[in-house]
Design a protein with these regions (language model features):
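Acidic/polar loop patches that form or flank catalytic/metal-binding clefts of enzymes
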Residues: 19-20, 147-151, 191-199
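Aromatic-anchored helix/helix-loop segment that forms the rim or "lid"
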Residues: 66-75, 109-134
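Active-site-proximal helices and loops of the catalytic beta/alpha 8
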Residues: 1-87, 139, 156-187
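Conserved small/polar residues in nucleotide/adenosyl-binding loops
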Residues: 205-207
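Aromatic/acidic polysaccharide-binding cleft in carbohydrate-active enzymes
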Residues: 90-119, 137-175
Length: 208
């Protein structure tokens, strides 16, 4: 299917791109006993970047610097650079908890929908979550790839899993500070081609 799709899409022009929803490392993904050739076999141009998402969350929430380095560099070392430069970098999707809830809320674990429906962040949790979200968005915008925002994240929307992560956009009740912060990140991101096409090196700093 993907071979046929790629051929049809590319027939419309080389500037047409194909993204795939792959939750793991797409360079060595194996399913149904078959190793997939998503990024090296003329199928996908790039993918949704779930590994970066988890690396960012674990770093911002738990301070896991080594895990962050490993998660990011593994992808960058495994993917062709054109695919890495096009990675869809997000912090929330319709399949996962809202980033604000993930950063500052209780772990959803195996809780059912009734439990999730009744849970909202306290004012203290919400404020703490916003501070972590800003840190996460800095990484989202300036790691290799393309920053992609799940509607409402920039406005401070919270929520657990589907359907609570799909609440309506909070028109008139947006967190204006977060929206302004997001706009500033976008301006900085567009200010230099290095953020879109440059090389990246991570350095671990030990503070005693």
């Amino acid at each position: 299917f993907l071979d046929t799709l790629n051929k049809a899409v590319k027939a419309k022009g080389d500037d047409k791109v194909i993204y795939g929803e792959v939750w793991e490392d797409a360079s060595n993904k194996e399913s149904y006993g078959v190793r997939r050739r998503y990024l090296i076999g003329g199928q996908l141009d790039s993918v949704m970047n779930y590994p970066f998402k988890e690396a960012i969350i674990n770093y911002c929430k738990y301070g896991d610097a080594r895990g962050f380095e490993a998660g990011v560099m593994t992808i960058l070392e495994h993917y062709p650079k054109p695919s890495a430069d096009m990675l869809m970098n997000f912090l929330s999707t319709h399949d996962t908890e809202r980033i604000l809830t993930r950063l500052a809320g209780e772990d959803v674990g195996c809780h059912d929908r009734e439990w999730q429906a009744e849970r909202y962040l306290s004012p203290e949790q919400y404020a703490y979550g916003l501070s972590l979200l800003k840190c996460a968005m800095v990484l989202q915008f300036f790691l290799p790839g393309v920053p992609c925002i799940y509607y409402g994240d920039e406005a401070g929307l919270e929520g657990y899993k589907d359907p609570f992560n799909r609440r309506c956009y909070p028109w008139g009740k947006e967190n204006l500070d977060m929206i302004d912060f997001t706009k500033q990140l976008a301006v900085i991101r567009k200010s230099s081609k290095a953020f879109a096409q440059g090389e990246m090196k991570l350095s671990l700093i030990h503070i005693s």
